[in-house]
């Protein structure tokens, strides 16, 4: 099994008197991560899977005495898919408060804020981490540099979900199953999501517009609804870790677009499954979009795994000057332009940005140099 970057961090945080919570989309390997953590431990452990109705009901209704009977002599309690339990925040608080010697390990496949379940009850009582599909750094440590280079096209098309990479011959079927609602099954359980067909249309529209600026008004017209519904559904898709937003950067220049936004997918394979397009790169018209989506998502994984805290944006002006992706850290900027064809790597960054802001680094990212920017 491929060792996840955050495993060392989790192991170092065990028995600090706080719950350890790992959130991320379904099937990114959260349960496997905890199994790997537990392989090296001998404490008695209780495993609870909240996809099972009886487990959900038991946890939701249990008082402190009933929790004591449930936990027994176990020193580690693993609660899987915890977001499915009503009032899960209070349940976890009750366990951490009443059983200080018990280590809680909790997974959630969507942001608990979907139902405002977690933050307030567990303030000061948790370590929380986000797990993504495999990062380039994790794959390099497991398989080496040559393998990472050789599998680039495959990852652009099929993505980096663990199950997909472990069963490449079944990648299409597995991705279709994952993208056809299983990935956002928690979202579909919400009362506020009354139109699953609309959600599917919206995902398709977003997949087609990857790397392009998005207008809620235009999306609403495309899928046949109103702006408010589009905004609400997009917010929920972000909280299920299917898509993420980049805002346009604007500060000093009057020509900068102030309300611009783009949406990217956490994983290329999910984006391609939504569009039902797994054609090889040589036969595609969207290679540039695949490359940009892939690099930005990999860069964000690398920043997260390395503990680099940056603000991420794109940049565009009313004069059509643009920068694909930029990061701000401590008042300095790193600029990135993505070019799949290395022969086009002589692009220059806009002089107006270079003169207005303090630029630490800039790079035209191609298949020849990308790895240096996405390893932890």
Language-model segments: what does each one mean?
Residues 71-88:
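Conserved P-loop NTPase "ATPase switch" module shared by AAA+ and STAND
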Residues 83-105:
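Conserved Walker B catalytic segment
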Residues 112-127, 143:
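Short regulatory helix/loop adjacent to the ATP-binding pocket of P-loop NTPases
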Residues 130-301:
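Interdomain hinge/linker elements that couple catalytic modules in large macromolecular machines
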């Amino acid at each position: 099994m491929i060792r996840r970057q955050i495993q060392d961090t989790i192991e170092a945080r065990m028995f600090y008197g706080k719950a350890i919570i790992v959130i991320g989309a379904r099937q990114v390997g959260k349960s496997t991560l905890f199994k790997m953590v537990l392989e090296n431990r001998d404490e008695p452990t209780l495993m609870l899977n909240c996809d099972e109705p009886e487990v959900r009901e038991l946890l939701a209704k249990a008082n402190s005495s009933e929790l004591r009977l449930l936990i027994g002599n176990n020193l580690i309690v693993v609660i899987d898919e915890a977001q499915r339990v009503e009032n899960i925040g209070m349940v976890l608080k009750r366990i951490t408060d009443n059983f200080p010697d018990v280590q809680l390990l909790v997974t959630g496949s969507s942001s608990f804020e979907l139902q405002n379940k977690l933050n307030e009850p567990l303030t000061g009582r948790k370590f929380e981490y986000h797990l993504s599909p495999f990062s380039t750094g994790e794959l390099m440590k497991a398989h080496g540099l040559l393998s990472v280079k050789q599998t680039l096209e495959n990852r652009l098309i099929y993505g980096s979900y663990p199950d997909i990479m472990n069963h490449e011959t079944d990648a299409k079927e597995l991705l279709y199953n994952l993208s056809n609602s299983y990935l956002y099954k928690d979202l579909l359980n919400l009362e506020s999501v009354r139109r699953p067909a609309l959600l599917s249309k919206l995902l398709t529209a977003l997949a087609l517009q990857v790397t392009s600026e998005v207008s809620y008004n235009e999306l609403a017209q495309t899928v046949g609804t109103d702006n408010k519904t589009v905004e609400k559904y997009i917010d929920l898709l972000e909280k299920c870790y299917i898509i993420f937003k980049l805002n346009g950067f604007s500060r000093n220049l009057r020509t900068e677009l102030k309300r611009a936004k783009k949406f990217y997918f956490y994983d290329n394979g999910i984006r391609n499954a939504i569009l039902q397009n797994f054609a090889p790169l040589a036969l595609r018209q969207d290679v540039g979009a695949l490359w940009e989506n892939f690099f930005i998502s990999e860069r964000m994984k690398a920043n997260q795994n390395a503990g680099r805290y940056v603000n991420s944006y794109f940049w565009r002006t009313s004069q059509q000057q643009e920068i694909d992706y930029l990061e701000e850290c401590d008042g300095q900027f790193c600029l990135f332009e993505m070019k799949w064809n290395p022969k086009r790597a002589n692009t220059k960054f806009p002089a107006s940005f270079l003169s207005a802001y303090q630029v630490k680094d800039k790079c035209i990212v191609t298949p020849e140099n990308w790895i240096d920017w996405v390893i932890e």
